Amino acid sequence: MELTLHEARVIGCLLEKEITTPEQYPLSLNALTLACNQKTSREPVLDLSEAQVQDALDSLTKKRLISEQSGFGSRVVKYKHRFCNTEFSELQLSPAAVAIVCLLLLRGPQTPGELRTRSNRLHEFKDVIEVEDCIKQLISRTKPILKQLPREPGRRESRYVELFSETSANVVTTSDHTDKLHTAPVAALVEHGALVARVTELEQQVATLTQKFDELIASLT
């Protein structure tokens, strides 16, 4: 699946609210819009209108990732995800994996340390190692749903990105390109060094042959 930025935000919010405020789930359009536009725990911070959120919901409904629910005697339509862990979902994830995917959908690429710090309301990880173990499982799936990004200068940990959204696809492409740009000069320097060493070796061989030739000429005269 490939989600737009708005679709990814909607799915992330539904995953989050299902866990953190189950008494308010499913969400109405108004509640979902407020969740999408939160100023905290969101990167980037968005300012979506209800019409934009409705467009995202309509698109997700066509992708069979959202279902509508109307309460008895209520005209308010509420929405719940079919993204994972439902009878209609191909994707089945552990609570730990749901927490990680949810955070990556809502806040973009993050390190294991950041994921552990920010996940306390979604899932309690004992330590960073438990986060890393879960990440490895998600990467090693037959169809990986996470990817490790090249470690950035000054960072002790690599960041990880989900592979569901077009935004994350752009991040992966940019990171791969940057990594190649860093790798190319290093490879060029290595190749240049090898050429210099070879030229020096040949020059020494020529000098040795020249000396022997001069000695041979001298012995014949």
Curated annotation (Swiss-Prot):
It comes from the Bacteria. Pfam families: DUF480. Belongs to the UPF0502 family. PANTHER family: UPF0502 PROTEIN YCEH. This is UPF0502 protein Sputw3181_2381. It comes from Shewanella sp. (strain W3-18-1).
